[in-house]
Regions:
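Nucleotide-sugar donor-binding/catalytic module of glycosyltransferases
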Residues: 1-158
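TPR repeat positional signature
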Residues: 185-186
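Conserved small-residue packing positions in alpha-helical repeats and bundles
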Residues: 189-192
Length: 251
């Protein structure tokens, strides 16, 4: 085990440093407060041997919250995902702590978008899935901490980065690809608006207004962004809490 320390420059810089310091051909990611179950690395290695050439190898995972541990909605089939962008619309396929990426893939598409503080995982997955297939195992071998993910600052600070979801838009790509880019960008805009980033959220509304599949999310961002800033955080917090309770009950 090698411990590397550096000044806090964000999660993307930390991941990129870890990738640079690592020596293996397959790089597994594990965020703070998340955990692996016994057999996770063995399953990743097994998939890499059975389905070579994929850009991401992921397993199913559990969501850990204040009120327990619950299985995330994920595919039930093991193997290469037919269409990552379509199949990710209503269920999880890849999250960092339940995934591994071949070193050669990072060398081809680049590392995580340094300076991006919201949506950096989806940005990375989009870049990879655009060029490579994704492999998935339905075995729940990782645990994602929803508690830790809710600890981010409630005050919006504009990102200082050259990366954005706008650059991922491709008019020549299949509709499913651009729709997924819009979904990721509008989901980020919802968080930004809730934190008070009115102008940046409005920019996302204008740019990604082309979406047909995620009109509901688009309207949600528009409505939230039109409200007084002091209302937005509590309102989206209440909405997310209710949505989580409904999802847990399978409604």
């Amino acid at each position: 085990v090698k411990l590397v320390t550096q000044a806090n420059a964000g999660v993307c810089a930390a991941r990129n440093r870890a990738i640079a310091e690592s020596t293996g051909d397959l790089i597994a990611l594990l965020d703070a407060d998340d955990t692996w179950e016994p057999g996770f690395l063995e399953e990743i290695a097994s998939m890499a041997a059975e389905f070579p050439g994929c850009g991401i190898y992921s397993t199913a995972f559990n969501i850990v919250s204040h009120d327990g541990r619950f299985p995330a909605p994920t595919p039930t089939e093991r193997g290469v995902v037919a269409d990552f962008f379509r199949d990710s619309a209503h269920r999880y396929i890849s999250i960092p702590s339940a995934s591994a990426v071949p070193r050669a893939v990072f060398e081809t598409v680049g590392g995580f978008p340094e300076g991006m503080k919201i949506g950096e995982d989806l940005y990375m997955w989009i870049k990879i899935a655009r060029r490579y297939k994704v492999c998935f195992s339905p075995k729940p071998l990782a645990n994602y901490s929803k508690v830790a993910s809710n600890r981010s600052s409630a005050i919006y600070t504009p990102e200082r980065t050259r990366y954005s979801f706008e650059e991922l838009y491709d008019p020549a790509a299949a509709d499913g690809y651009n729709e997924f880019v819009a979904r990721a960008a509008l989901g980020k805009a919802l968080i930004i608006s809730a934190k008070g980033g009115t102008k940046d959220a409005a920019r996302a509304i204008r740019f990604f207004g082309y979406t047909k599949t995620y009109r509901r999310t688009l309207h949600k961002v528009r409505i939230l962004n039109a409200l007084p800033r002091s209302w937005r955080g509590p309102l989206i917090g209440l909405y997310n809490s209710l949505a989580w309770r409904i999802a847990r009950k399978g409604l």
